[in-house]
Amino acid sequence: RPDYATVVYCTLIRHTYKKLPIIIGGIEASLRRMAHYDYWSNKVKRSILLDSGADIISYGMGERSIIEIADALDSGTDVKDITFIDGTVFKTMDREIIYDAIERPDYDVIKEDKREFARSFYIQYCNTDPFCAKRLVEPYDNSTLVVQNPPQKPLSQDEMDEVYALPYMRTYHPSYEEAGGVPAISEVKFSLISNRGCFGGCNFCALTFHQGR
C-alpha cells in the first residue's frame, strides 16, 4: 500500500479512465476533506479532493450519501452537478451555488499562519453536528472552491441493523496469517455497535470529526 494511497490510486484511475466519475471515501479521504496538517511532509496540504483529482468525497460513514450519489448518477445527473447531498464534499468555481455557506480562511493564508489554521479548523469542528451544521467553503488561489455540505443524518435503528447484518467476514485479511494474525481482532470480534460518533472533544481522537457528535 503506497503512502497517500487515495491520491495514488485516483491518479492511476484518472489516467486510464479520463471521464469516469471518481467518488472517494473512508477514513483517509474524510479526515483530509479540507486543508489539513500532514505529519509525513510536516506541511498543511490542500483538500485531498484537489490532490487526488476525484469528483466527490463521501465523508464520515457514508452509507446514505453513497446511495444518493449512485442514484443521481443513474438518473443521468452530471457528477459536477451533484452538489446537494449531505455528507459530501465537492469542488466548484461558481460562487452563486454556495451563497449560504460559511467561508473558511483562504488556503494560502492558513498554510502560512498557525492561528488562521486553528481558526479554520475550529469552524469545521463546530460544524460536525448533522442537525445544526452549516455548509462550509474553502477558497483556493485559482478561484476553485472546495465545499463541504453538512454531515448526513444519523441512520435509523432499522438502517443500522441492516448495515451490520450484512455478510462481513468479521476477521482480518488472510494475508496477515503468516505474520501471526492481528491480535487486536480479539478486542472487537464480538463487539455490538450501539451508536456512532462521540459527545467528547478529545485532542487525540478523530472520532467526533469523522462520525459526528
Give the location of each predicted region.
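Glycine-rich beta-alpha loop elements in corrinoid/cobalamin-binding modules
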Residues: 1-141, 148
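Radical SAM [4Fe-4S] cluster-binding motif and immediate context
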Residues: 126-213
